[in-house]
UniProtKB/Swiss-Prot annotation:
Sequence segments annotated as region (Disordered): 73-101
Official protein name in the record: Putative RNA-binding protein RbpA
InterPro entries xref list: Nucleotide-bd_a/b_plait_sf (IPR012677), RBD_domain_sf (IPR035979), RRM_dom (IPR000504), SLIRP/GR-RBP-like (IPR052462)
Pfam families: RRM_1 (PF00076)
Organism: Synechocystis sp. (strain ATCC 27184 / PCC 6803 / Kazusa)
Molecular function GO terms recorded: RNA binding
Compositional bias (Basic and acidic residues): 73-83
Amino acid sequence: MSIYVGNLSYDVSEADLTAVFAEYGSVKRVQLPTDRETGRMRGFGFVELEADAEETAAIEALDGAEWMGRDLKVNKAKPRENRSGGGSFGGGRKSYGGSRY
């Protein structure tokens, strides 16, 4: 399982997030996505702890807590959805009949 951490300060680092979550257990991984074009932090991240019980304790303690001047949103991360499905933009044209000419 992974934890979603939202409403993060744009100044936060992986080390900052690791330090906060280390109070609840052994941090396996921290991920802070950045904007592809600007390289700037996107204001959210993901943290993975060693055990589910540690993650549950961290979620309960930190959801709504103020940190770096912001109220954190902390919950179980949802599995990433496949972006290729759904509405295609012009890619699925239907052909009715034969040649245009």
